[in-house]
Amino acid sequence: MTEFKLTIIIDFMRQLLGLLAWLSKPVLGLMFLLCTFLAEAQHSNIRITNVATSNGSWSLSGSTYIFTATGDNANLNVTDLQNYLRTNSVEIKTSRAAGTQVGSVVFDVGVSVTKNSSSGSAFVFTISSGGEVQFNASMSLRNSVYTNYPGYNVVVTAGGSVRIGGVLDVSGYSNADGYTSLPSPGSVSMVVGGDLTVLGAGQVLSRGINNTYQYLSGSSGGVGGLQSYVVSGGIDLQVGSVLNAGGGNGFATQSYVTTGGVGGAISLSGVNGVLLRGSIQSVGGSGYQGGVGGALTISSSASYVDYGGVLSSQGGNAFNANYQAGNGGNISLSGFGGLSIRSDVNAGVGAIGLSVTGGNISLSDGNGVLTTGGGVNDGQVGGLLRGNNVTKLGVGVLGIGGANAYTGTTTVSAGKLYVLQAESIPNLSALSLSASTILDMGGVSESVGSLAGSGKVTSSVSGEVLLTVGSDNTTTSYSGMMEDGLGVLRVSKSGTGTWSVSGANTYSGLTQVSGGGVLSIGSSSGLGSVSAGTEVSSGASLELYGGISVGAEPLSLLGIGRSSIGALRNLSGVNAYAGAITVGSGVRVNSNAGSLSLTAASVFTGSNASMLFGGAGILSVGGVVSLGSGAITHDGTGSVYLLADNVYSGLTRVSGNGTLRVGSSGALGSNSSGVEVIGSGVLELVGGISVLGESLSLAGYGNGVVGGFRNVSGNNVWSGTVSLTGNAGLGSGSGKLSLTGSPAIAASSFGLRIYGVVGSSVELVGEALYTGQTELVSGSLLLGADERIANASSVMFNGGNLSTSGYTETVGELSLYAASSISLGSGVHSLRFSSAGVYDFKLLTINGWQGVYGTPGSSGTAGKVYVGTSAVLTRERLDQMRFYNATGPATHYCLQLSDGELV
């Protein structure tokens, strides 16, 4: 009947609203509120006191006793409530069809119950309220000593606000009686339609038990119970308030290795502002192995989170420093409308015991700007963060300050992380900036373990700031941008790892590389603007990759780089560097692959500094090298090009399997110390130059088919003396190499191979005094004057050509191993071989002979060729020689006259 009447009333009010549509807005609002009140007032208030129960009754539904109001202002006697709670689950309900009140539930007296049942399931104390719920006194709902039996779960569903002014305790009970499995604590779950307020004297406890039983393996601490608060309004934890779900302590016994209890998770989720001035803790219990801290999650979906109390999910302590401390639990703070952290956030490991891993800290901030007024939405971390990883979420600005002690990574997934104080991020923390995020240095310096990601680094405050990256010695890649902002940003790469930077940086401060690590740049502006330059300390390296062209950035180099890879190294690609480079003694520069072109007018400058070049790629030095008395050594397998007139007086050395190309007459510096080429090393000349007075020590046949000393392009002159320190090769791949020294080749017993291609030649203008064999492999050996080759040097024709150029020459034994040729010049001259050596049934062609062809026995009239001093060649050997008549044209067989002449 009552419900029918209510329906009639509501329908009447709706019709009335329609008739009064022309009324003012205040009248309409009043009508709406009246309608809403009539629809929601189907509740009665219930108060828990010491007075006898009235206006309410008990009923049993399944295994749950339900107290329901039968009239408004119902009263529930606390003793009645306790008796029911002691044996079964209980629910208090305010809903009543005929009720005219909002349905509040108020606890004016304390409730204390010890579960007196061996039920294996937790009892549930449910409060279903249409209005607010007030805990004005304490409530203790705990399990008895029965083994492994859970206690009470408190479930509150309130249509209005919840206020906690006493102690709500559902913690585990003592294990003094020695049960091997621990009684579990209860849990607390609240869904609040209004605000949640925990007064200064208010506490919610769901702690695990402290185990006091010392003989059995059940001596470990109890786990903490869960606490969950879902609030449609705001949350206010006042100074002195406590939420505690910590794990219990294990018994300190030597008989068993006990474990501290794991902390229970605590979750606070509000829609409006969350003001935290109390204590929220879920610390792991102590034991020979500390317990893990519980997870703490605090959020506001539409407003701020302002924390200024105690927040700890620290792991438990170990009883003994030789055992493992507990891991910290994760902590998450999320304020859609802003986040302020005024006190420490502790997700660290236990203070005693072997170090393990702290919990992760997630900070989600919605501040549009960072303020400094100390308001609830200032976006600042004023306390210290202790734990493992810290993650910045949310699109807002979050300021971090203080000497934070978390040990894991720092991740900015969204928004801006603002550095309030110098070194606020732990030095070993790996920093990762997601796309479109910002690290704002705030006018102070910061050191991080590493930097990865693609966000931006800047400073919104004036002054010089230093960003130091690399102390965790890892390898990371960063594609974001580093800029000055309003300050001047300096960047320092420390540690032994590799930091790859590929963004378009614009910062104007100095770049430093130290600590044995590598700064690898894949952008032409990877080092910022060119104004302040870059310094590479001994043991560290600067790398280039990706086809970049660095501007006129001054560069200072020391040492040979990390693991001898070079203080400056081309990693890959065709790259260029236009800055002047200052070097200390012993600096190494390598081109690992690809090519590196150094294009400054003055490339290398050092005070009596020697340099090392290496790698398998190409290093092109286009400007002047000024090293004082320093030397240059190329020991790589690639090529080094010296293209300018250089200023140094030390030895130039080519070893390994590499090539040193000289493109300027003065590229090898002064001629006081000379050049040394050994092994498979190569010295190349290009461009039609004349290298004056430079001595060359040569051993080996080079790394190709044209010798260890070779002409590459143009007609080039070497006026110094070549000394053979081993059997060696020289040649010309194109053009002519003229040896004009006095002597051209110094005396030795080693042999010389001559290489070349068709149309190229090596010219002996000066004397060749070596007595070892002269082997003509390919190309042409030209005589530049009479008697250039030592008489004792035998000649092996192995595919090459000997051109007299009209000069007389006397040499040792003639051997024939491959089809070869002799070219005679014009004018009267002779080429004399002392005797005949090995003939390998190959053809030796003599070009340019002048005489009567077709008349056997007719001596030559200009150039003549002799083998021995009598007719020593057999018919078989003579048949391996031919005269080529270019005017015939025809090829003629060879005869030998009695004086040894071949005709």
Annotate the PLM regions.
Residues 92, 127, 156, 188-190, ...:
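Residue-level detector of buried hydrophobic side-chain packing
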Residues 114-121, 138-152, 167-187, 201-226, ...:
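Glycine-centered low-complexity coil/loop motifs and glycine-rich tracts
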Residues 43-207, 229, 235-239, 352-354, ...:
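Extracellular beta-helix/beta-solenoid repeat scaffolds
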